[in-house]
Swiss-Prot record:
Family label: Belongs to the FHIP family.
InterPro entries associated with the record: FHIP, FHIP_C, FHIP_KELAA_motif
Protein name, UniProt field: FHF complex subunit HOOK-interacting protein 2B
Pfam families on file: DUF5917, KELAA, RAI16-like
Coiled coil: none
Length: 698
């Protein structure tokens, strides 16, 4: 209480002092700081127990009062004097001319008395935060600021991270308000000259004439990676604000010339290496919720917690890298992306992805899936997808597999290990959800653009209705459809409005998929209505995803190509997997059908024609999704003759799957589960055909 009263009285006295007395008071307090070093020989006394902290606070209070007093005089005086606002008072002039900041920086480096560095950091922080006039363009200010930033790596004395962050945050706040000042913090001191105004043009000239210092970014990134969660988050936010505000050519050039992108990538690689080899791949993909803004404390008690904490730190840094790219200038974003590609993708991840050990494959695939799940910045997505799949735009040929990495990732969807196949299929499911065309075009679209899957003699000008009924007659003659289109009890919506809005032929597309599985081997009498709502939601999401891709609204390509049709490596593997649905594990079947259903909902006319139109006439040697399903159903019909009571077994297996239990051991369980998945997949495709060719999809 008495201390506050004394401070109040002293402030009241100081407000009545004339300018000359204010300067004398400022000089007196500064001499009080220097006098300590002349009179005191006790080197063990901490700085906080001396009068140095109090005198430094008095210096700041005097400077703040002087500035506010000059501002009030300006507002009440002649407003035409535009230069008066930038005129420094006598106390500020004394601070600049007598190099007080340089002296304080020297005392901080010496760390005498103990804790002096913290006091100097606080003084700088308060000076930059409380004094409103620009200061960083002065040589006698930005040079000691540079030196104080560089002290972060000085082993002499232990700099408190809290005070250091407070100082760096104050510097970043000034840079955020005026990014042209960045040149005075990053430039080399040997070529610096005093400037009274940090204009944008001067900043750009300096940026090109001086090699940037690295201390600011190194200090910030060191705090960004510390174990104190709150300090870590504040440091990341400070760096993010600087990059977000630096949009002019000069600051952008300085940042690109700095080693910021290198430091970011190096820490990403370091965190990747810290992920224990013992961590299970499922734990990597299961960690869905991460946020770099949340505290990441270091309280870990056992090995498992250490592994999870290491993984979380890595994924949080991945998210932060994505945020840096999104918020930075385009040139800076491309530089960070390039560094991540060269340092992390090519240097760390690619060698792991190409390993042959099953555990290594599972681990690297899970990490890649988790990383891609967290990327939203366009430069990062494009760089990653181009790195994985290349930039070829022409159709694939059967003998050419492309890059080794692309070929390996696709082929692993059909790996001997079901676990690797599942992980690879989930990776591609993640990739297909990305708002970039690169992957989908490389995997599927480029092979369908010429429509060479169509027979050369097919009349493409005929209407949908004629095409539909001709195809229906062909199906009726198929030996696997001896009953034609049996009455399944399934009916499309029959309201007049719905009937008038559906294009001709859509109903026959739907019926074709619903009629694929014979009644004798069905395990459910429910229709495809349960899939319609999900199909509508997913179709709208797909339309939104591809809205900016410039896809055609109608099929293009003649269908007459001299080159043999090849569906591409990816579709070859998927259709091959679908062909083995009766002999594969249940989880693999679910993942394969999920991927194909997702592809069928993309609003590309050629893709929908190839996957959803049962009535196209295929070129010799070509296959479509429907033709593969016909063969699978034929195989199922043949096998059903050798399995007694198959329909009862199918009903029992369906109940077990719905209950997620397997209490009763059954024969032919893989076959029965495959048949159930096949039946439901046909319903999914029927819903997709209905939604994609009907206004209900919108």
């Amino acid at each position: 209480m008495w201390g506050r009263l004394g401070a109040f009285l002293q402030q009241a006295v100081e407000t009545r002092e004339p300018t000359q007395d204010l300067l004398q008071s400022f000089i007196q307090h500064w001499k009080g700081v220097t006098q300590y070093y002349l009179e005191t020989s006790d080197e063990s006394c901490p700085a906080r127990e001396t009068d140095i902290p109090w005198r430094l606070r008095q210096l700041i209070d005097i400077l703040v009062f002087e500035e506010s007093n000059n501002g009030s005089q300006l507002s009440s005086g002649d407003e035409e004097d535009s230069g008066a606002g930038s005129h420094a008072g006598p106390c500020m002039e004394y601070l600049l001319q007598h190099k007080i900041l340089e002296t304080l920086c020297t005392l901080a480096k010496a760390e005498y008395p103990p804790g002096m560095r913290q006091q100097v950091l606080l003084f700088y922080s308060r000076l930059l935060a409380k004094v409103q006039r620009p200061l960083l363009h002065y040589l006698s200010v930005h040079r000691p600021v540079q030196k104080l930033i560089a002290l972060a790596e000085d082993p002499v004395g232990a700099t408190a991270q809290k005070e250091e962050l407070q100082f760096l945050t104050a510097v970043c706040t000034k840079l955020e308000k005026d990014p042209s000042l960045l040149v005075h913090v990053l430039e080399e001191g040997s070529g610096s000259r005093v400037r009274c105004s940090g204009g944008e043009q001067d900043g750009e000239t300096e940026a090109r004439n001086h090699k940037p210092r690295q201390n600011l970014f190194k200090a910030l990134l060191r705090l960004c990676t510390c174990q104190k969660g709150r300090l870590c988050v504040r440091a990341r936010e400070a760096l993010l604000r600087v990059l977000h505000s630096a949009q002019q050519e000069g600051p952008v050039h300085l940042i690109v010339q700095s080693k910021l992108s290198q430091y970011v990538t190096e820490h990403l690689c370091e965190l990747h290496r810290c992920i224990p080899l013992s961590i299970h791949p499922c734990d990597i993909t299961a960690l869905q919720e991460t946020d770099w803004r949340k505290d990441s404390g270091s309280q870990e008690s056992d090995g498992m917690e250490n592994a999870e904490a290491a993984l979380q730190r890595f994924l949080c840094w991945v998210e932060y890298c994505d945020c840096l790219v999104r918020e930075s200038h385009e040139v800076v974003a491309m530089e960070i992306t390039r560094s991540i590609k060269e340092g992390y993708l090519q240097g760390i991840l690619q060698p792991e992805l190409l390993e042959v050990s099953e555990l290594s494959i599972l681990r690297s695939t899970a990490i890649l899936t988790a990383v891609l799940h967290r990327f939203t910045a366009t430069p990062l997505l494009r760089q990653f997808l181009t790195f994985l799949f290349g930039d070829e735009r022409g159709p694939e040929t059967r003998g050419d597999r492309g890059s080794q990495l692309r070929s390996q990732l696709i082929q692993r969807c059909n790996h001997l290990s079901d676990e690797i196949s599942l992980a690879s299929l989930r990776l591609f499911e993640e990739i297909l959800q990305m708002p970039e065309e690169i992957a989908l075009h490389s995997l599927v679209i480029r092979n369908l653009e010429t429509r060479s899957y169509l027979a050369g003699g097919q009349d493409e000008s005929r209407g949908q209705e004629s095409e539909t009924w001709d195809g229906a007659e062909e199906l009726e003659e198929d030996p696997y459809f001896t009953d034609g289109f049996p009455d399944t009890g399934i009916r499309l919506p029959r309201s007049d409005n719905a009937h008038r809005t559906e294009p001709a032929g859509t109903e026959q597309w739907v019926k074709s998929f619903l009629s694929l599985v014979p009644e004798e081997i069905k395990s459910s009498d429910t229709g495809y209505d349960g899939y319609l709502q999900d199909a509508i939601v997913q179709y709208r999401a797909c339309c939104q995803q591809v809205a900016q891709w410039g896809w055609p609204v109608s099929s293009k390509g003649t269908g007459h190509s001299q080159q043999e049709f090849y569906e591409g490596h990816f579709m070859e593997v998927l259709l091959g997997r679908l062909g083995g649905i009766l002999d594969q594990p249940y989880d693999v079947n679910l993942q394969v059908t999920s991927l194909l259903s997702r592809l069928a909902l993309f609003p590309h006319p050629n893709l929908q024609e190839y996957l959803l139109n049962p009535f196209i006439t295929l070129a010799p040697g070509a296959r479509s999704l429907f033709s593969v399903l016909v063969r699978v159903v034929a195989d199922l019909a043949q096998r059903s003759l050798r399995v007694p009571d198959l329909q009862e077994m199918l009903l029992l297996v369906r109940r077990q799957l719905l209950a997620n239990s397997a209490n009763e051991q059954l024969n032919h369980v893989t076959l029965c589960r495959g048949a159930v998945v096949l039946e439901e997949f046909c319903k999914e495709l029927a819903a997709a055909a209905c939604v994609t060719h009907s206004p209900v999809g919108f």
